[in-house]
UniProtKB/Swiss-Prot annotation:
Belongs to the AccD/PCCB family. This is Acetyl-coenzyme A carboxylase carboxyl transferase subunit beta. It is an enzyme of class 2 (transferase). Its EC number is 2.1.3.15. GO terms for biological process: fatty acid biosynthetic process; malonyl-CoA biosynthetic process. It comes from Rhizobium leguminosarum bv. trifolii (strain WSM2304). The gene is accD. It catalyses: N(6)-carboxybiotinyl-L-lysyl-[protein] + acetyl-CoA = N(6)-biotinyl-L-lysyl-[protein] + malonyl-CoA. Component of the acetyl coenzyme A carboxylase (ACC) complex. Biotin carboxylase (BC) catalyzes the carboxylation of biotin on its carrier protein (BCCP) and then the CO(2) group is transferred by the transcarboxylase to acetyl-CoA to form malonyl-CoA. Its main location: cytoplasm. GO terms for cellular component: acetate CoA-transferase complex.
């Protein structure tokens, strides 16, 4: 069978001029089932054109889209111990790291960059959810701390884009240590007088929600994002009650005062710039009243 698969079939395909078609050319909308060509999805910032559903956006694409002309300085990835607990579940942790690095072309879940958004200098930190669920381990924690230190030294704001399932279980207590470490880093930035803005994306859960993801001066959220600590199913089983419709979505949190604004992905750079100008007491153009609610909200914060 291997001989047929590895030799005969490729020879026949080459003779007939047939090519193997990648499986991920078409993306299915989770809400409507609509099939979207991957190039069209990428060109629309990973938002389904018809339904407006916000798909998960790769970290590299997020940074390139955020900064002016896609120009920014990538902050270095810190070196930490690899698999210090020699952890193994159904698979070796070292193998999970290797596979995730091949899949995402990243060293770990965090990417950070220094650049300008509509002329305002800032540091942006982005989670890559496809790297072990965007989980927070030693490497991610150290990268976040270093990014906050860079923003403090540059005397500029920091914008966080969390997308995570929480702490990385394969690193045990070493992962949990990153929660207080990142919290201290947030406090140091705030003590320096610089704003800290969080843009909550889908999903933001677990220990990340319990630490730096909910410590911002202003919290924006993308439409339909799942935001919470424990999952909806776990809460229902624990309480033995049915939760409200839309529970743990960004719109539900906005209605209940946990989020300041729900902002479409296309509007995030402009909204961030306008809010940051108010927080840093810089002139704000009012010619375009898009997201004027953000201005009023930030001014009263």
């Amino acid at each position: 069978m291997n001989w047929i698969t590895n030799y005969v079939r490729p020879r026949i395909n080459s003779m007939l001029g047939r090519r193997e078609v990648p499986e991920n050319l078409w993306i299915k909308c989770p809400e409507t089932g609509e099939m979207v060509f991957h190039k069209d999805l990428e060109g629309n910032k990973w938002v389904i054109p018809a339904s407006g559903y916000h798909m998960k956006m790769p970290a590299k694409a997020r940074l390139a889209d955020l900064f002016d002309n896609g120009d920014y300085e990538s902050l270095p990835q810190p070196k930490v111990a690899q698999d210090p607990l020699k952890f193994r579940d159904s698979k070796k942790y070292s193998d999970r790291l290797r596979d995730s690095r091949l899949k995402t072309e990243q060293e770990d879940t965090i990417l950070a960059g220094l650049g300008k958004v509509q002329g305002l200098k800032l540091v942006a930190v982005v989670h890559e959810f496809n790297f072990i669920g965007g989980s927070l381990g030693m490497a991610a924690g150290e990268a976040i701390v270093k990014a906050f230190e860079r923003a403090t030294s540059e005397k500029c704001p920091l914008v966080m884009f969390p997308a995570s399932g929480g702490a990385r279980m394969q690193e045990g207590i070493l992962s949990l240590m990153q929660l207080p470490r990142t919290t201290v880093a947030v406090d140091l930035l705030k003590e320096s007088g610089q704003p800290y803005i969080v843009v909550l994306t889908n999903p933001t859960t677990g220990g990340v929600t319990a630490s730096y993801a909910m410590l911002g001066d202003i919290h924006l959220a993308e439409p339909g994002a799942e935001i919470g600590f424990a999952g909806k199913r776990v809460i229902e089983q624990t309480l033995r009650e049915k939760l409200p419709e839309g529970f743990q979505t960004s719109e539900y949190l906005l209605e209940h005062g946990m989020v300041d604004m729900v902002v479409k992905r296309h509007d995030i750079p402009e909204t961030l710039a306008r809010v940051l100008k108010i927080l840093t007491k810089k002139p704000v153009s009012v010619a375009n009243n898009m997201n004027s609610g953000a201005i009023a909200l930030a001014a009263s914060a």
